Amino acid sequence: MTILNHTLGFPRVGLRRELKKAQESYWAGNSTREELLAVGRELRARHWDQQKQAGIDLLPVGDFAWYDHVLTTSLLLGNVPPRHQNKDGSVDIDTLFRIGRGRAPTGEPAAAAEMTKWFNTNYHYMVPEFVKGQQFKLTWTQLLEEVDEAQALGHKVKPVLLGPVTYLWLGKVKGEQFDRLSLLNDILPVYQQVLAELAKRGIEWVQIDEPALVLELPQAWLDAYKPAYDALQGQVKLLLTTYFEGVTPNLDTITALPVQGLHVDLVHGKDDVAELHKRLPSDWLLSAGLINGRNVWRADLTEKYAQIKDIVGKRDLWVASSCSLLHSPIDLSVETRLDAEVKSWFAFALQKCHELSLLRDALNSGDTAALAEWSAPIQARRHSTRVHNPAVEKRLAAITAQDSQRANVYEVRAEAQRARFKLPAWPTTTIGSFPQTTEIRTLRLDFKKGNLDANNYRTGIAEHIKQAIVEQERLGLDVLVHGEAERNDMVEYFGEHLDGFVFTQNGWVQSYGSRCVKPPIVIGDVSRPAPITVEWAKYAQSLTDKPVKGMLTGPVTILCWSFPREDVSRETIAKQIALALRDEVADLEAAGIGIIQIDEPALREGLPLRRSDWDAYLQWGVEAFRINAAVAKDDTQIHTHMCYCEFNDIMDSIAALDADVITIETSRSDMELLESFEEFDYPNEIGPGVYDIHSPNVPSVEWIEALLKKAAKRIPAERLWVNPDCGLKTRGWPETRAALANMVQAAQNLRRG
């Protein structure tokens, strides 16, 4: 029983983000389709070769995607929304990009598919759309072509396919409502056809991803698995693949399926290996997801060995990454600026492949010397002074309930704030950022590269802040912002100014399409060595008599958009960040800043996959926000900003944040989101976004007025604010000026009644 290793998928973008550059060049019309396809071929060949060189036995094929793998599956099944279809029904790479980016075959704008988070990761997928009576057929054969490609290169491959039940679960019904699960029998023949084609190519194992099996699924969905897999059995061996959580609660459903193996995430799940071994059919292969595919930390392989060794020789066993390595940067070896000690604690995708090879070899031979050697740095980290800051740990331990309570209730605070700011009815503001022009980006880049000294950099930033204030005063906004010219990214900026974080040069991870992010890494206890935003906020406030908002990114968002430590809980990290930012609130207040916004766009997306785990998360998430904000005096107004499409299931927690004002994204849902706030009888002030900043379209005064009147039917007008639905960083100045002028005019019209 020789143990093999495999990965569930590999990063697609390339070490130097070659895929991103090729996509954007093609979209801009600067390169041909052939040139784009050639970059894809080159990247796939390189990535298979790199995994093989690192000792991976079975290489994943089908993990590459031109936009995202769920969209690839939609095209495979011929599921193209009518507005994006070619007249002759054909499907090509442009069809795929149109669904992702929003264009009709004629070149006219046509709404892109909705995009949402892939389970609880920071990766996104395009949501499949289903209509009643829909037909499916094998249409886009990218998977089969890539299998041919890999086999021609002499590789031993394992195709990767998103499973039928999870695919339907991830989609949404459009138009007349019906149960999308009823489409299962219509898509199964396409899956049968794909598996038959793979069998023809001599494929032994297919990795069929059903991550929905880690969720608390409705019974009807659990019941759908057996007939689905009865229909798919027999052509090739199926490795039923789950990740991001454990499978024990759904194990009875799983063990009844006619598959030949099961992959489980032994990093994020709480499944017990001995229990799994006992309950799985004895002839099944177990793929043990022991190496974390979602983080950047070197594994303690001695621990991983101990976790699995008792079942070695008792059943067929593979060792694997917990999930696809898509969520990890590619290669640590190109990081030249990381301190040697810190660098020794990390492993990126290629290093994780090496870990899988070390683990496989040790399990096959019983010789663990190499594991001990590999694990030494991560074991030494436990005692590093870079990790532990006694002052932070002491302060965290001393938190009391009082630390998360404002001095008085909202009604008392609102009176103090009205007396201080004397704002008109329908007060106008923006969410924080203004257009990041080429000049601003060049200024920051020159400073970062050392081509510009600190004095000239500061003079340049001050000039852009001054311009933002002048623009806002000219437009007649009531509460101003400094525009965030000095910030590259709302999380990275704070991470760079807090102790306990490090940054990589090339640690890029795909978010969706061509968008990549470079998350900060939390390596130790978090603290604030010096004020972060105070100087620029104070400068902006000195330029105007109107209030200027201080702008902070909240603790839960900083946590969710970073690679967290693995040696303490997420709650601990969030509260450490909250304490650091609490001091920032106090300093902003002392500097005369009376309105402070703490953005928490990630509060909802941090929710655990299982609803039964939500309460615990929301409790500490809300507490972290309140620790951050509660130091503010009554007449300091705390704002928060959130952008999601779903509030009703967490309204209690939104209200529990106790922010004086919440601004939300509502324009795309035509104010329907406010229903949740109305039904809940939300007590504080609210700024429903009146226009969609993701679109270059300028909303008319009438359109904004109509939306605000609609909002006033749900929320008392005296508690409403007027604002766009998100920051304006990605927009140009001409449309920003035009849209804000119309927004201010609409508010003035409503004041006149």
Curated annotation (Swiss-Prot):
**EC number assigned by the record:** 2.1.1.14
Q: Which UniProt keywords apply?
A: Amino-acid biosynthesis, Metal-binding, Methionine biosynthesis, Methyltransferase, Repeat, Transferase, Zinc
What CDD domains would the database entry show? CIMS_C_terminal_like (cd03311), CIMS_N_terminal_like (cd03312)
One Gene Ontology BP term is: methionine biosynthetic process
**Catalytic reactions of this protein:** 5-methyltetrahydropteroyltri-L-glutamate + L-homocysteine = tetrahydropteroyltri-L-glutamate + L-methionine
State the coiled-coil residue ranges.
none
The domain of life is Bacteria
Q: What residues make up the catalytic site?
A: H694
The Gene Ontology terms for molecular function here are: 5-methyltetrahydropteroyltriglutamate-homocysteine S-methyltransferase activity; zinc ion binding
What does the entry list as the binding residues for 5-methyltetrahydropteroyltri-L-glutamate? R17, E18, L19, K20, K117, R515, C516, W561, E605
What the entry lists under InterPro entries is as follows: Cbl-indep_Met_Synth_N, Cobalamin-indep_Met_synthase, Met_Synth_C/arc, UROD/MetE-like_sf
Q: Does the keyword Nuclease apply?
A: no
Indicate which residues the UniProt annotation says bind L-methionine.
Answer: I431, G432, S433, E484, D599
Q: Which NCBIfam families match?
A: met_syn_B12ind, PRK05222.1
Q: What does this protein do?
A: Catalyzes the transfer of a methyl group from 5-methyltetrahydrofolate to homocysteine resulting in methionine formation.
Q: Return the similarity comment.
A: Belongs to the vitamin-B12 independent methionine synthase family.
Name it.
5-methyltetrahydropteroyltriglutamate--homocysteine methyltransferase
Q: What's the source species for this entry?
A: Escherichia coli O17:K52:H18 (strain UMN026 / ExPEC)
